[in-house]
Design a protein with these regions (language model features):
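Active-site mouth loops of central-metabolism enzymes
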Residues: 1, 47-49, 101-103
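Alpha/beta enzyme core
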Residues: 1-42, 56-65, 72, 78, ...
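Glycine-rich beta-to-alpha transition loops that act as phosphate-gripper elements at the mouths
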Residues: 45-56
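Short hydrophobic alpha-helical runs that function as membrane-insertion/retention elements
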Residues: 47, 69-72
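Extended, intrinsically disordered, low-complexity segments
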Residues: 87-121
Length: 121
């Protein structure tokens, strides 16, 4: 089924659902044996959506099974939004949206760099 799907769609990457979940409200339970089985029959590298909340040792193990890309949207959104929350808590009256937006983008960039470093280690 995997090889047929790739052949029929011509996709370059295949996003898989192996216990990964979107958001941070549900604990992911990644099925590494299933990921390994899929990797053996997939002619293209694999992608995992819902990477936020998955322990890095699981991600590193998953990379052994042709996992090329992991999406961390919730972690990056959390880094962005927490900037505003922390600033508001620190000083309710002195919140410059422009300055906070710049700081939020910097925080997202730092978080993204951290995730890339961990994944590539």
């Amino acid at each position: 089924m995997v090889a047929d799907f790739v052949a029929q769609t011509g996709c370059d990457l295949l996003a898989v659902a192996v216990g990964n979940v979107h958001g941070l409200d549900i604990e992911p339970k990644v099925d590494l044996p299933l990921l390994e089985q899929i990797s053996k029959i997939s002619p293209v590298p694999l992608v995992m959506h819902g990477g936020s909340g998955i322990p890095f040792d699981i991600i590193q193990k998953a990379r052994e099974f042709n996992l090329l890309k992991v999406n961390y949207g919730s972690d990056l959104r959390k880094a962005f939004v927490s900037t505003f929350g922390q600033a508001y808590e620190a000083n309710h009256n002195a919140c410059s949206v422009i300055e906070l937006s710049i700081e939020a983008v910097e925080n997202v960039s730092e978080k993204a760099a951290e995730l890339v470093t961990i994944i590539n280690s």
